[in-house]
C-alpha cells in the first residue's frame, strides 16, 4: 500500500502564526519532535524564519542560530529531517549535519546556488510556488509553468526527478479564490512526473472554509479535510501541525484507496 507521508512542522521561531515561541529552544524542540514521531510523523520540517503575512526578514546569522542547534540535536532520530529555508548557506550547513531534505519556499528563485548545494549532498528538495501575486496568466497555468521550469533547473543541477517535490503554495501569492482554484485542480500538478506535497495546515484558506473567525488551532479538523481531499487527488505528502489527527486520517484514506484500486484490478 502506498503510504501518504506526514511532515510534522517544527517552527523554531518566536513569531510563526500558529506556534511561534513554543519550540524555539533545543529542549522544547526535542520534546516536540519525539511527540510527533510517536504520533506518526515520517518527516520533521524545521523552520527558522516565519513566513506568515507581514513577517519581518531575519538575518542569515539569526536563522543559523535558530536552526542549527535544533538540527544537530535531532538529526540522529529515526525520522527524515527537512529544513525549511530559501538560503543556500543555511541549507549547506544543515546538509553537512545530515538532514535529508530542503524545503525551499522560493523554489530556487531567491538563491540560485540552492540546487547545486542540494545536488552536492544528494538530498531531496521541495519546490514551493510563490511570487508577488502579479501574473499574466491564470493561477494554475502560471503555477505549473513556474514550478516545472524550476524543477527542470534542479535536474540540470544534478537533482534526480524522484528527489524533487512540488508544493502548490497555498497561502502564498494567491487570493482565496485562486487558492480554491488550485485545490480544485491539484490533479494537474499530480499529473507531472514529480511527487506533490500539500501544505494547508491552519492557514487562512482553512479559515475561509470554516466560514467564520477561528484561531489557528481551531482549524485542525478542516485542515484534515484538505488532507483527505489532497490524498484523493493524488498528493504524496502533507505538511501539518497536528500530526496525530492527519496521520490517522491519511492511514484511513490510504486504505480505502488501496481497496478501491484492488477491486478495479479484479474487475
Swiss-Prot record:
This is Dihydropteroate synthase. Its cofactor is Mg(2+). Residues 1-251 form the Pterin-binding domain. InterPro entries: DHP_synth-like (IPR045031), DHP_synth_dom (IPR006390), Dihydropteroate_synth-like_sf (IPR011005), Pterin-binding_dom (IPR000489). Its EC number is 2.5.1.15. GO terms for molecular function: dihydropteroate synthase activity; metal ion binding. It catalyses: (7,8-dihydropterin-6-yl)methyl diphosphate + 4-aminobenzoate = 7,8-dihydropteroate + diphosphate. (7,8-dihydropterin-6-yl)methyl diphosphate binds at residues 84, 103, 167, 203, 239-241. Pfam families: Pterin_bind. GO terms for cellular component: cytosol. Catalyzes the condensation of para-aminobenzoate (pABA) with 6-hydroxymethyl-7,8-dihydropterin diphosphate (DHPt-PP) to form 7,8-dihydropteroate (H2Pte), the immediate precursor of folate derivatives. Mg(2+) binds at residue 11. Homodimer. Belongs to the DHPS family. Keywords: Folate biosynthesis, Magnesium, Metal-binding, Transferase. Pathway: Cofactor biosynthesis; tetrahydrofolate biosynthesis; 7,8-dihydrofolate from 2-amino-4-hydroxy-6-hydroxymethyl-7,8-dihydropteridine diphosphate and 4-aminobenzoate: step 1/2. GO terms for biological process: folic acid biosynthetic process; tetrahydrofolate biosynthetic process. SUPFAM superfamilies: Dihydropteroate synthetase-like (SSF51717). PROSITE patterns: DHPS_1 (PS00792), PTERIN_BINDING (PS50972).
Amino acid at each position: 500500500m502506498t503510504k501518504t507521508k506526514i511532515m510534522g512542522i517544527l517552527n523554531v521561531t518566536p513569531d510563526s502564526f500558529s506556534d511561534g515561541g513554543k519550540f524555539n529552544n533545543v529542549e522544547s524542540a526535542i520534546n516536540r519532535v519525539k511527540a510527533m514521531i510517536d504520533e506518526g510523523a515520517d518527516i520533521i520540517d524545521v523552520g527558522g524564519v516565519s513566513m506568515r503575512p507581514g513577517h519581518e526578514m531575519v538575518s542569515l546569522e539569526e536563522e543559523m542560530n535558530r536552526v542549527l542547534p535544533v538540527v544537530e540535536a535531532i538529526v540522529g532520530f529515526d525520522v527524515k529531517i527537512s529544513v525549511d529555508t530559501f538560503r543556500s548557506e543555511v541549507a549547506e550547513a544543515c546538509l553537512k549535519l545530515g538532514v535529508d531534505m530542503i524545503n525551499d519556499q522560493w523554489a530556487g528563485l531567491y538563491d540560485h546556488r540552492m540546487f547545486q548545494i542540494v545536488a552536492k549532498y544528494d538530498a531531496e528538495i521541495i519546490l514551493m510556488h510563490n511570487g508577488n501575486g502579479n501574473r499574466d496568466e491564470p493561477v494554475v497555468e502560471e503555477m505549473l509553468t513556474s514550478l516545472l521550469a524550476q524543477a527542470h533547473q534542479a535536474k540540470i543541477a544534478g537533482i534526480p526527478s524522484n528527489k524533487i517535490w512540488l508544493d502548490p503554495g497555498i497561502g502564498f501569492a494567491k487570493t482565496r479564490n485562486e487558492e480554491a482554484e488550485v485545490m480544485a485542480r491539484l490533479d494537474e500538478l499530480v499529473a507531472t512526473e514529480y511527487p506533490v506535497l500539500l501544505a494547508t495546515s491552519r492557514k487562512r484558506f482553512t479559515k475561509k472554509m470554516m466560514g467564520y473567525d477561528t484561531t489557528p488551532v481551531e482549524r485542525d479538523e478542516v485542515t484534515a479535510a484538505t488532507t483527505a481531499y489532497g490524498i484523493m487527488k493524488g498528493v504524496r505528502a502533507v505538511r501539518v501541525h497536528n500530526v496525530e489527527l492527519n496521520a490517522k486520517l491519511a492511514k484511513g484514506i490510504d486504505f480505502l484507496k488501496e481497496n478501491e484500486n484492488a477491486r478495479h484490478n479484479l474487475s
